[in-house]
């Protein structure tokens, strides 16, 4: 029984180390959200910081509300990409280490 507990503790420590490394990688990653067929693009980090907003020059002749809607849509697209990549990264880190049917709230 003692060996099993020691093995479980090693797995938990390895999981913690892997999770910390994954969180750092995710924080440093950048995704690009787009809207309007690429007319608006947002570069966002894994920490949801907006690094860059690019608006195609043709849009400046359009109405203000449409540009605002496209910026919001591009931000939402970037947020969804960060969430998807975070979930994929974390689930790959924990696969095989958790009991069957147990999921982390990611």
From Swiss-Prot:
It is found in: Cytoplasm, Nucleoid. SUPFAM superfamilies: YbaB-like. Its main location: cytoplasm. It comes from the Bacteria. Belongs to the YbaB/EbfC family. PANTHER family: NUCLEOID-ASSOCIATED PROTEIN YBAB. This is Nucleoid-associated protein Noc_2594. It comes from Nitrosococcus oceani (strain ATCC 19707 / BCRC 17464 / JCM 30415 / NCIMB 11848 / C-107). The lineage of its organism: Bacteria, Pseudomonadati, Pseudomonadota, Gammaproteobacteria, Chromatiales.
